[in-house]
UniProtKB/Swiss-Prot annotation:
It catalyses: GTP + H2O = 7,8-dihydroneopterin 3'-triphosphate + formate + H(+). Pathway: Cofactor biosynthesis; 7,8-dihydroneopterin triphosphate biosynthesis; 7,8-dihydroneopterin triphosphate from GTP: step 1/1. One of its GO terms (biological process) is tetrahydrofolate biosynthetic process. This is GTP cyclohydrolase 1. Residues 14-37 have a biased composition (Basic and acidic residues). Its EC number is 3.5.4.16. Homomer.
Amino acid sequence: MDAVLKSLSVRLPDAADKRSDTGRPERVTERPTRQEAEAAVRTLIRWAGDDPEREGLRETPQRVARAYEQIFGGYRQEPTHILDRVFEEVEGYGDIVLVRDIPFHSHCEHHMVPFIGRAHIAYYPRRGVVGLSKLARVVDAFARRLQTQETMTAQIADTIDAVLNPRGVAVMVEAEHLCMAMRGVQKAGVSTLTTQFTGVFKQDPHEQVRFLTLVRDQR
């Protein structure tokens, strides 16, 4: 039987918004021009102690600006739109859906240094399922911003919960933070793990154990 598609309409903070210290979005009122961004890179090169006009660095400001457009492309995405179509005809399936080992890279909002890792997402469908690739796209939409791992974990779970209205969502994120490896304490290879649960996963510890077991199975 052909799957039945349905579009969902849910209003969450716009992708052009940024978070305040409280976690609530704050409108970005003015975006600098590309020329201003490139000038800022030249200033940083000089501050680091090098000459932005030497041959190897002459085109670096343009390259950095182009790279940042891709690296921080999540600001131009609305994660709720990624999930706005569901397959309602799933032949009675109502058990857990798990997508694990979703690779991502993000940037620490404190030092603008990368943190790199994997996300694991599970949910119990209530009225339909989304394409599996959509969950990976939601991870990317939030990861490609200035972030903390804790906030990103909560954003992923809360968005899936708000849009799909499942019986529960579980998200685990594990990552290595280069700000910890390259500066400060300088401890490479240290992993940070964060989790966020909603619905049955939050209410029932056995469901949390099941999720964690499935994530770790055959590793």
